[in-house]
Design a protein with these regions (language model features):
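Gly/Pro-rich hinge or "lid" segments in bacterial periplasmic/extracellular proteins
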Residues: 30-52, 56-58, 62-141, 149-151, ...
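Short, hydrophobic alpha-helical packing/hinge segments within bilobed ligand-binding/sensory domains
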Residues: 103, 153-154, 173, 209, ...
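Periplasmic binding protein-like
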Residues: 163-164, 299-334
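Extracellular/periplasmic solute-recognition and catalytic clefts
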Residues: 115-126, 143-201, 220, 224, ...
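Append "and occasionally in soluble cytosolic enzymes with long acidic Gly/Pro-rich linkers
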Residues: 126-127, 185, 205-300, 307
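Second-shell loop/turn segments in exported
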Residues: 1, 47-49, 100-102, 143, ...
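Aromatic- and charge-enriched surface segment that lines or borders ligand/interaction sites
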Residues: 1-25, 60-62, 153-156, 203-205
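Short, well-ordered beta-strand elements
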Residues: 8, 59-60, 110-113, 123-124, ...
Length: 334
């Protein structure tokens, strides 16, 4: 089927449908009245969302306000079209997790087609000969292997089993720099690594405790001694240079202030110390190293005992979504 403006309009309406519950629907909020429709205040026609099909190959988008970064925003997959017949065949218009994404059912319009998926084993894609720029696609296919252990992944690369890997253990960086200088590359990466507090339960329902934990983190030591991959200490939630944004540093390392804030909370609650805090992260050697490093900082500065709890990815996502955590790993990637 040809990709038309109707496919985009249908896809935008679907992702904004409040019954679908898409996590990235807000990416389309720059469209006029999109938030009103998504939040259930008005029906699609009544809301007059700023999406209009002028003809099969002309789509008109009207914005709520001027958005200087709008063209860059369109690179996000939330703006990509979905195949309407496939969506409707599998009842996926208002449902997430139906069979429409299985290899035998999925229909896309990118340079590759999903050809196989063995859970926890491999994802395979093959070249899409119907792609508009197929002549520029040099690869016949790609296999993606989900490997949790970074050393296993590195060994698979060095043996020739993998052609490319993005995960390297911090403990191996110096060795790889020396032995494989032409293979190891550090590339700019737009993202922020952070921890999420559960604000609905003690002790993080109190701002003083949250600030104390934040001030007790030595970000310089974390990136220099633990991560070692050229990361920058995060002093704001949004990384510098995002869409020309120059953030004002908000986070700093101040152990004395951290101790005072926590002591104020403990005195008010009549406590000698905080009960053990459970820190949840999805299974990964890298996440474990960061968690252990922060555990040490919080124990040394605040006298807090941290219990580390790792979970399989889907279980982790479900637990966080349900609010079943005290402190959890998180990330934001642009």
């Amino acid at each position: 089927d040809p990709v038309t403006a109707h496919d985009f309009a249908y896809s935008f309406r679907r992702i904004l449908n409040p019954n679908l519950g898409s996590q990235y629907a807000s990416m389309l909020y720059p469209l006029k009245n999109a938030s009103s429709y998504h939040q259930g205040h008005k029906a699609w026609e009544e809301a007059e969302v700023g999406v209009a099909v002028l003809d099969d190959f002309t789509l008109q988008l009207t914005l709520e306000n001027p958005v200087p970064y709008f063209l860059q925003l369109l690179n996000h997959y939330s703006w990509f079209p979905v195949h309407r017949p496939t969506i409707e065949k599998h009842g996926a218009y208002e449902k997430i997790g139906t069979a429409w994404t299985k290899p035998q059912n999925f229909v896309g319009n990118g340079p590759f087609l999903l050809s196989g998926h063995q859970i926890n084993s491999v994802i395979e894609v093959k070249k899409n000969d119907a792609y508009w720029d197929a002549d520029a696609v040099q690869l016949k296919g790609i296999r993606f292997y989900p490997i949790e252990a970074t050393f296993t992944e590195e060994r698979a690369y060095r043996s020739g089993f993998l052609h490319l890997t993005q995960s390297v253990s911090a403990d191996r960086i110096d060795f790889l720099k020396e032995k494989y200088p032409d293979d190891l590359h550090f590339e700019p990466y737009l993202g922020t690594y952070f921890y999420r507090f559960n604000l609905k339960a003690p002790p993080f329902d109190d701002q003083r405790v949250r600030q104390a934990f934040c001030l007790a983190v030595d970000r310089e030591r974390l990136v220099d001694k633990v991560l070692k991959g050229g990361q920058l200490p995060a002093t704001s939630f949004t990384p510098p240079g995002t869409g020309g944004f120059s953030p004002t540093p908000r986070f700093r390392y101040d152990p004395d202030s951290a101790k005072k804030l926590l002591q104020s909370y403990l005195d008010e609650k009549g406590l000698d110390r905080l009960p053990p805090i459970e820190l949840t992260y999805n299974t990964s050697e890298g996440h474990k190293k960061v968690a252990e490093a922060l555990h040490g900082m919080w124990k040394d500065t605040l006298g807090v005992e941290i219990r580390l709890l790792n979970m399989e990815w889907k279980v982790f996502l479900s637990s966080v979504a349900k609010g079943e955590f005290t402190l959890a790993r998180a990330g934001w990637i642009g």
